[in-house]
Curated annotation (Swiss-Prot):
The keyword Cell inner membrane does not apply. The keyword Iron-sulfur does not apply. PANTHER family: MANNITOL PERMEASE IIC COMPONENT, PTS SYSTEM MANNITOL-SPECIFIC EIICBA COMPONENT. Homodimer or homotrimer. Seems to be a monomer when not phosphorylated. It comes from Staphylococcus aureus. It holds the Pfam family PTS_EIIA_2. This is Mannitol-specific phosphotransferase enzyme IIA component.
Length: 60
């Protein structure tokens, strides 16, 4: 997991207009770094509850 948490994959003070835009930006960074494929970004769950959306795996 350390390759996912490099300084290149941490973004501070990024302006977005929606949760979806934030997820898209984070997903694009992971795709660009080669950590995941675009297909993965399209199917990953993001809902965590209480207005929080974080890409995460599921049991499916």
């Amino acid at each position: 997991m350390s390759e996912l948490f490099s300084n290149d994959n941490i973004f501070l003070n990024v302006n977005v207009n929606s949760q979806n835009e934030a997820i898209e930006k984070a997903g694009k960074a992971l795709v660009d770094s080669g950590a995941v494929t675009d297909a993965y970004i399209q199917v990953v769950s993001t809902f965590m509850g209480n207005g929080l959306a974080i890409p995460h795996g599921t049991d499916d």
